[in-house]
Regions:
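Nucleotide 5′-phosphate-binding alpha/beta core
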Residues: 1-98, 104-109
Length: 109
């Protein structure tokens, strides 16, 4: 067997095993993903504003983080457009897209 084939086969086996874990345990996978997102979000301006460090459960999240509209995060987007980091998510976005703004004008997402 050709060496790259061995690597690809081993990697495919690894991915298959990982996929089976979340397929067979979807609630555990969702909980781990939730915890990772909250952990990473703690480092951001948005996460600090909504006290992500206190969030342990989905109910904590629901009671701490409001449902928002674009206008609510517009100040955060402005900071990102100025080049600031760790605003809505750790680091900086690769790029911002300009929407057509069908209901209320142009927006950056």
């Amino acid at each position: 067997m050709f060496f790259p084939d061995l690597i690809i086969k081993a990697y495919a086996k690894y991915i298959n095993k990982k996929n089976k874990l979340w397929i067979n345990n979807p609630l555990d996978a969702q909980q781990k993903t939730f915890e990772l997102l909250i952990k990473n979000g703690r480092k951001t301006v948005y996460g600090k504003k909504y006290r992500f460090e206190k969030i342990q459960t989905y109910n904590d999240f629901k009671s701490s983080v409001p449902i928002i509209e674009y206008e609510d995060i517009k100040p955060f987007i402005s900071l990102i457009r100025k080049g600031e980091k760790n605003i809505l998510w750790p680091g900086s976005p690769i790029y911002l897209c300009k929407t057509s703004g069908t209901t209320s004008g142009t927006k950056f997402i």
